[in-house]
Amino acid sequence: TDTKESDFLAEGGGVR
């Protein structure tokens, strides 16, 4: 989770 994009992708693919 480096950036916002990487964060949501790592968290749950942006479905969070």
UniProtKB/Swiss-Prot annotation:
Primary location: secreted
Gene Ontology cellular component terms for the protein in this record: extracellular region
Keyword Coiled coil: yes
GO biological process, one term: adaptive immune response
Keywords: Adaptive immunity, Blood coagulation, Coiled coil, Disulfide bond, Hemostasis, Immunity, Innate immunity, Secreted
Location(s), subcellular: Secreted
Posttranslational modification: Conversion of fibrinogen to fibrin is triggered by thrombin, which cleaves fibrinopeptides A and B from alpha and beta chains, and thus exposes the N-terminal polymerization sites responsible for the formation of the soft clot. The soft clot is converted into the hard clot by factor XIIIA which catalyzes the epsilon-(gamma-glutamyl)lysine cross-linking between gamma chains (stronger) and between alpha chains (weaker) of different monomers.
Source species, domain of life: Eukaryota
Notes concerning its domains: A long coiled coil structure formed by 3 polypeptide chains connects the central nodule to the C-terminal domains (distal nodules). The long C-terminal ends of the alpha chains fold back, contributing a fourth strand to the coiled coil structure.
Annotated function: Cleaved by the protease thrombin to yield monomers which, together with fibrinogen beta (FGB) and fibrinogen gamma (FGG), polymerize to form an insoluble fibrin matrix. Fibrin has a major function in hemostasis as one of the primary components of blood clots. In addition, functions during the early stages of wound repair to stabilize the lesion and guide cell migration during re-epithelialization. Was originally thought to be essential for platelet aggregation, based on in vitro studies using anticoagulated blood.
Oligomeric and partner information: Heterohexamer; disulfide linked. Contains 2 sets of 3 non-identical chains (alpha, beta and gamma). The 2 heterotrimers are in head to head conformation with the N-termini in a small central domain.
The name this protein goes by in its record: Fibrinogen alpha chain
